[in-house]
Structure formats: C-alpha cells, structure tokens
A protein has these predicted regions:
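Charged DNA-binding/catalytic regions of mobile-element recombinases
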Residues: 1-224
Length: 224
C-alpha cells in the first residue's frame, strides 16, 4: 500500500496459494507457571490512559509488558517498553526469571535512551513486577507517572500485547531455541534489526517506528 500498489486480501490469498505459502498465526502457546500473577496488597495505581493508544509527541506515554519464550535450557522472559507515539521499542531486558529487576532494567534502558521530561506515563498491567517498590522508586526518581489498567483486562494494554504477539509469530513462531543465549540474540536482532527500523504499522501511515520518528521528530526535544 505504501508503494501505491492496490490489492486485497483475496488477491494476496490467491497468490500465496499459488506459491504454496502459508502465513504465521498467533496460537495459544504453553505458558510457564507463575505468569500473570497479580500483586498482593499493592498500592492502588490509577489508569491514566483509559485505552487511549495515541500521543501527540514522543515520551508522553510508554506501555510495558513481559512475555516468555521457550528454550531447551528453560524459559526466557522478556520485558519491553514501547513509546505509544511511534510504536518504537525503547527499552527491553531478557533473563531466566520474571522479576522486578527484569522490568526495571527495561525501564532504565528507556529512560537512558529517551530522557523523558517530567510527566511521562508508564502504563502496564497489575503484575507484581510493575507494582514493586523497585519500579516505584525508578519512576519516582525519573518523574514518571505510573499507570495500570484494570485487573485481568488485556485490552487495557493491547498495544504491547500486539508487540509480544509479533515477536511470537514473526521471530519465535513455534520454535524451541537451543539456549537462552540464542533466543536473546535472535530477539535482539528482530527488535533492533527489523521491528524498529523496518516493520510498518498502519497506525503510523505505513511507516516503521524509526521512519515515523525521523519524519516527525523535527523541532522536538527528547523530553515530552
């Protein structure tokens, strides 16, 4: 579409059928024990987003989530932070355990690379990692406002759910990596070599996150 070529789903399906191609799907993969655990007795955090997945500029709202990938060494967990303005992954961290430190490392990477001004929103689910004292301190020190969607409502964090779905279907896709190291290297290459610079989004006018930022960042500062 962005090259001016008119097409339709039926035409794409016909061409794929002629060449014997099959698209990838996002199935219900097995998940490790303990994922989806909500924080017990955590302080109440308001929803500052309200399913508004848009922003007028960079660093107004970041969305965060954690996913998991199977390897022959065991599960690998990945925490990611996305800037909703450009859909760019601005922070990520991977490790063998789903801890507060994992989520905090991804947030600290985002803070280091983006240097947001006071008032940037960090939106997540109610997972114990995001409700931790460690995350609270990091956000407070950076002037970031915490935000959490409703409990057990994936629609409140739909953009990062979509990101994790892309990683599963386009990078992992029914594979079992030999080691966590192999998974880390391939997911890193997917994010930095494809998702941010190449993968187009309809919400960005069929531009990739990097292309969108290059076209729209002019005259802006790193701070929101």
């Amino acid at each position: 579409r962005r090259q001016g070529v008119r097409t339709s789903r039926k035409r794409v399906a016909r061409i794929m059928s002629e060449y014997g191609w099959r698209g990838t799907t996002r199935g219900n993969a097995r998940r490790p024990r303990g994922t989806g655990k909500q924080a017990a007795h955590a302080p109440r955090v308001p929803d500052l987003v309200g399913r508004d997945f848009s922003a007028k500029g960079p660093n107004e709202a970041w969305f965060a989530d954690i996913t998991y990938v199977r390897t022959r060494q065991g599960w690998l967990y990945m925490a990611a932070v996305m800037d909703i303005w450009s859909r760019k992954v601005v922070g990520w961290s991977m490790g063998p355990r789903m801890t507060a430190e994992l989520a905090d490392d991804a947030l600290r990477m985002a803070i280091s690379t983006r240097r947001p001004g006071p008032g940037c929103i960090h939106h997540s689910d109610h997972g114990s990692q995001y409700a931790s004292l460690l995350m609270g301190r990091t956000m407070r020190d950076a002037g970031i406002r915490p935000s959490m969607g409703a409990i057990s409502s994936p629609w409140d964090n739909a953009v990062t759910e979509s990101l994790m779905g892309c990683i599963k279907s386009e990078c992992v896709h029914a594979r079992t990596f030999d080691s966590r190291e192999q998974a880390v290297l391939e997911i890193f290459d997917y994010i930095e070599g494809f998702y941010n610079p190449v993968r187009i989004h309809s919400a960005l006018g069929w531009l990739s996150p990097d292309e969108f930022e290059k076209a729209n960042w002019k005259g802006r500062t790193q701070a929101a």
